Amino acid sequence: MLSLLLLLLGLGSVFSAVISQKPSRDICQRGTSLTIQCQVDSQVTMMFWYRQQPGQSLTLIATANQGSEATYESGFVIDKFPISRPNLTFSTLTVSNMSPEDSSIYLCSVE
């Protein structure tokens, strides 16, 4: 059975907002799902979810506004990467049906 190593990083302090992301890393089995939480210490309008695959630059997955559906970038779909944004300080990204191609660094950022 193939295991996938994921590094999950938050972009520390941005414009005086402190971001924490959990879990900080995880190893997942093929076919499983992983939910990543992003918590901000102040209310923010927009949250962004990124992925960085080995040897590649950061790629924006989606932008999440509180109270509305996330806006996905080309190549990313809600079925694979569902995002929740229940309030102005919290968001989750789920990576569904994990495969070797999902081995990446995932991170959130705010504006």
From Swiss-Prot:
Its predominant location is membrane
Q: Which InterPro entries match?
A: Ig-like_dom, Ig-like_dom_sf, Ig-like_fold, Ig_V-set, TCR_beta_variable
The cysteines covalently paired via disulfide bonds are C38-C108
Looking up Pfam families in the UniProt record yields:
V-set
Chain coiled-coil ranges: none
Signal peptide (UniProt feature, chain positions): 1-16
Question: Quick check: keyword Glycoprotein in the entry?
Answer: yes
Keywords, A to Z? Answer: Adaptive immunity, Cell membrane, Disulfide bond, Glycoprotein, Immunity, Immunoglobulin domain, Membrane, Receptor, Signal, T cell receptor
UniProt KW Signal keyword: yes
Provide GO CC annotations from the record: plasma membrane; T cell receptor complex
Q: Which residues form the Ig-like domain?
A: 17-111
Report the glycosylation sites: N87
Which PROSITE patterns does the protein's record reference?
IG_LIKE
| GO annotation, biological process | adaptive immune response; cell surface receptor signaling pathway
Q: Where in the cell is it found?
A: Cell membrane
Function of the protein: V region of the variable domain of T cell receptor (TR) beta chain that participates in the antigen recognition. Alpha-beta T cell receptors are antigen specific receptors which are essential to the immune response and are present on the cell surface of T lymphocytes. Recognize peptide-major histocompatibility (MH) (pMH) complexes that are displayed by antigen presenting cells (APC), a prerequisite for efficient T cell adaptive immunity against pathogens.
State how it assembles: Alpha-beta TR is a heterodimer composed of an alpha and beta chain; disulfide-linked. The alpha-beta TR is associated with the transmembrane signaling CD3 coreceptor proteins to form the TR-CD3 (TcR or TCR). The assembly of alpha-beta TR heterodimers with CD3 occurs in the endoplasmic reticulum where a single alpha-beta TR heterodimer associates with one CD3D-CD3E heterodimer, one CD3G-CD3E heterodimer and one CD247 homodimer forming a stable octameric structure. CD3D-CD3E and CD3G-CD3E heterodimers preferentially associate with TR alpha and TR beta chains, respectively.
Protein name per UniProt = T cell receptor beta variable 29-1
Q: What gene is it encoded by?
A: TRBV29-1
